[in-house]
Amino acid sequence: MCIRDSIATEAMDRLRTTGDSHQRCMVAEVMGRHVGWIALHSGIAAGAHVICIPEVPMSLEEITAQVQRAHDRGRAPLVVVSEGFTLKGMDEAYSDKGLDAFNRPRLGGIGEVLAPEIDRLTGIETRSTVLGHIQRGGSPSAFDRVLATRLGAVSYT
């Protein structure tokens, strides 16, 4: 697990606590553009009930069915979504923020699209949070440090 994964996982642990105390569904949007490894790794580590990644489009019905199952078992559902995730039927990732410095769409906001739909279709109060730039900071994990040391050692020899 790398810095981004552990920071995202810690944030999701806090979201789970909030969801549990209020019996809400929490949607956590993480960065990653068109690659879902941050969402996948942190979602698995945090015990998310639904993980939405760009590589695997899902329908709103599939998402809400999993949310409802978790809620029916007495859980406060946690949904982790990568910013580049597309719902089945969407042509491209959600973007309403213009273009970035490389003239690509600025991704983000899919969590705010999903949350009210989950709420509407399940009747479960749902909140969305974008983890954003907080994922970019933090101290390297032990794994990160060992990996960097090994890479340095191999490149030196």
Question: Predicted regions span which residues?
Answer:
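Conserved small/polar residues in nucleotide/adenosyl-binding loops
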Residues: 1-5, 154-157
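C-terminal non-catalytic interaction/assembly regions of soluble proteins
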Residues: 106-156
